Swiss-Prot record:
Catalytic activity: ATP-dependent cleavage of peptide bonds with broad specificity
Domain of life, source organism: Bacteria
GO terms for biological process, alphabetical: proteolysis involved in protein catabolic process
Gene Ontology CC: HslUV protease complex; proteasome core complex
Keywords, in A-Z order: Allosteric enzyme, Cytoplasm, Hydrolase, Metal-binding, Protease, Sodium, Threonine protease
Residues annotated as binding Na(+): A166, C169, S172
Lineage: Bacteria, Pseudomonadati, Pseudomonadota, Alphaproteobacteria, Rickettsiales
Record's protein name: ATP-dependent protease subunit HslV
UniProt-annotated catalytic positions: T10
Family: Belongs to the peptidase T1B family. HslV subfamily.
Length: 182
């Protein structure tokens, strides 16, 4: 099995409904077709819990990028968009960073951003973003639920969407962890 396949072996979902922003992640760590851990924590908070980061891909690479983002957040006074763009510049220009196999979703009260392994910074439409092998399942479910279930909270939509993704993606599980942007 290709090592590149490990890059997408997870599900991270972020959504905003009204003023509520939730990031959710499954807990499964896989290597090839083997589950190594089912209770991993793939979400981190920075800037006094005002910014939440979820990462998919190589754990070591994700943590390395998280540390670099945290430095940028401190450097640019918790300005998420500026910090993400500056990290992306470094990511594109640094030989070491370009080899890292990870993607991140980062969110604060104003922005939901996807940072890709190519150094892209993408602000998704429709207030929903997802990455990882189960990302498209979670994204589709969340967009449908947001369109047709007005009575559900952001947290309820995230949980239902993540469970659908876990039902369909063998590299994601039902051990869902959620963080709310404050």
């Amino acid at each position: 099995m290709s090592d590149n396949f490990a890059l997408h072996g997870t599900t991270i979902l972020c959504l905003k409904k009204k003023e509520e922003i939730i990031i959710a992640a499954d807990g499964q760590v896989s290597h090839g077709n083997t589950v190594l851990k089912s209770t991993a924590r793939k979400l981190r908070t920075i800037a006094n819990n005002k910014i939440i980061v979820g990462f998919a891909g190589s754990t070591a690479d994700g943590l390395a990028l998280f540390e670099k983002l945290e430095i940028k957040i401190e450097q640019y006074n918790s300005n998420l968009l500026r910090s993400a763009v500056e990290l992306a510049k470094d990511w594109r220009n640094d030989k070491y960073l370009r080899r890292l196999e990870a993607m991140m979703i980062v969110a604060d009260r104003s922005h939901i951003l996807i940072l890709t392994g190519n150094g892209d910074v993408i602000e998704p439409e429709n207030n929903v973003a997802a990455i990882g092998s189960g990302g498209l399942f979670a994204l589709s479910a969340a967009r449908a639920l947001m369109s047709y279930e007005n009575n559900l909270t952001a947290e309820e939509i995230a949980l239902k969407s993540m469970n659908i993704a876990a039902d369909l993606c063998v590299f994601s599980n039902h051990n869902i962890i959620m963080e709310k942007v404050v």
